[in-house]
Amino acid sequence: NEIEYIENGIVTSHKGIDVSKYQGDIDWQAVKADGVEYAFVRLGIRGYGSGKIVLDENFADNMQGANEAGVKAGVYFFTQAVTVEEAQEEAAFVIANLAAYDVPYPVVFDVEMITGQDGRANNLTMQERTDITIAFCEAVKAAGYTPMIYGNVKCFTKMLDMTKLEQYEKWYAFYDKYMYFPYE
């Protein structure tokens, strides 16, 4: 589904995609030809049971393909960190894997809960999750990248103290026809 935002008769939106191993092999030249301007590529995850950090198996191909096709790229990492130290470990993993690529778009910290399952980070307090998020974002910023936080209404209203995260960009996930967010 494509959505265009029009302001004063001018399209103000940009076409982008997010990809991971689940999209399989991608023809990035075709993606560019379809008008896609940017992509967020999944860099990896921390396992919700094991806590093991795993690189997305298509990360390198997707980053190389996006860079070669001229599609501006950012990355995202799905966290299951349960301590500030684990968030710093995740950030170091992400930063180390970005060195070979052009990454003009943000490095995104995905803080969603594992629904219907027992994710290792599901029982964090708001303060713990906020501290973990700050630790990741500050490490990414110190490395010269733009940090961003991914979440939905639940993440941004019940799981994180947004007053402590105002300085970071947000990627707001909303899967309905009309956008709703109860805060500025």
Residues covered by each model-derived region:
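Boundary/entry segment of secreted carbohydrate-active catalytic domains
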Residues: 1-42
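Hydrophobic faces of well-ordered beta-strands that scaffold small-molecule active sites
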Residues: 15-19, 39-41, 71-77, 107-109, ...
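Acidic-and-aromatic substrate-binding clefts and catalytic sites of carbohydrate-active enzymes
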Residues: 16-27, 44-58, 80-89, 154-158
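Conserved, mostly hydrophobic/aromatic
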Residues: 17, 31, 66, 109, ...
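Surface-exposed substrate-engagement region within the catalytic domains
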Residues: 97-107, 111-184
